[in-house]
Amino acid sequence: MKKILLLFFYFPLLAAAQLQIKINTITIDNSDKNHRKFNIEYTLENTTDKEIAFFFTPNHFNSAHRGSLQTAMLFKIYENDTLIPADGILSNSKNDYSKLSNVLDIEEKMKTLDKMKADELNITIDSLRSYRKKITSDPDFFQKESSKKLMSSIIRLPSKSSKTYHQDLYWNKKRYFKTDDNEYYLGETSPFFIELSIVALKEELSFKLSSEDFKTIKNDTSFIKGYFTSNKTLIDLSK
């Protein structure tokens, strides 16, 4: 969280006028008794007279409490007007990673984690392990893959244009959360709100890029930097 706040004050205030994030609708699916599914429709709009570009992964959401050096859409949850200082309320899948803390056997824990990750990425466990082995054993491969992944996440919006996305998020209906030393219990009848944000970075992500790709990005004048926030919208976390 501190990183996000520092980056916010570092960026020029005019940056907020370049990119607008708007939550359009949130659709609820209660067909699963263990999870509540939210489909969030949101729009990114270039409000300037020229093309803008930025690193962004639209199909992955993360809690804003996890830090800002990432390309995911960040979200914050509020109860009434109070920011909830907790992580793990919403996730990109139904996988419950909190259960891993109860698995004492390291080998069993890694098998369970691999299965969860493979399911999320829609790949086989063997493919996941092979990829991980290459990354950990070959620094050049890691740098190449990291740069390739980041460059493929570039979003470009022409002048005065917009693009709409949909993202599914899941809530496991738990009300007690603990993040570091923070404990929180979600009120059963309180109104809750979600707010989305993008931290558009450039030089700050140079460590993930090859020297050639970083040079390309550095010389691209359409790349924007800034902290962009959406409207707050009601999200149903009631009992």
Language model features with spans:
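Bacterial Sec-dependent N-terminal signal peptides
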Residues: 1-23, 42
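Low-complexity, acidic Ser/Thr/Pro/Gly-rich terminal tails and inter-domain linkers that flank the onset
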Residues: 17-34, 235
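Asparagine-centered strand-capping/turn motif at beta-strand->loop junctions
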Residues: 30, 42-51
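Short, solvent-exposed loop/turn segments enriched in Ser/Thr/Gly
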Residues: 34-41
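A mature extracytoplasmic/lumenal domain signature
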Residues: 48, 56-58, 169, 198
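Short acidic, flexible loop segments centered on an aromatic residue
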Residues: 55-83, 88-94, 120-144
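Intrinsically disordered, low-complexity Pro/Gly/Ser/Thr-rich segments with frequent PxxP/GP/PP motifs
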Residues: 84-119, 123-126, 140-179
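Terminal connector regions
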Residues: 136-144, 155, 166, 171-237
